[in-house]
Amino acid sequence: MLTLDKFEEASEKVKEVTLETKLIYSDFLSDQTGNKVYLKPENMQFTGAYKVRGAYYKISTLTDEERAKGLITASAGNHAQGVAYVVLYGDVYDEACAKAYELAEKEGYTFIHPFDDLAVATGQGTIAMEIFKELPLVEYILVPIGGGGLATGVSTLAKLL
């Protein structure tokens, strides 16, 4: 279950490896929409994406035994960079994911799902902590959706705050 305490814990943890990206006011989008629009440039993270937040927090929640087994994931790109060294497999995500599950089972690796994991979503949701810290009266947060982990984390934390 995603709780405010978990988000606060994750927020402190991901500070070890992430930048607190500052909101940038967009004149163009504000003019186009008639609203004040701010952008959160997570592309400034050292991996080029927010995914390191979820991956790092998830790894921090693993036991020493789980980490010692080795970690494996499947990714369309950015989540894998957040986890570790990458070996590309397959032509599409589903092929990579199937292979990752196969190797996790065969080798005993700990599989870290890129979005279907509460700890990953919690880590990704730390973005909302930073948004509300900088802009406490935010009315709307528009979140891009791929697998849904970022949307899960951000929307859950927004409701909790």
Question: PLM features: what roles do these ranges have?
Answer:
Residues 1-161:
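PLP-dependent amino-acid enzyme catalytic core
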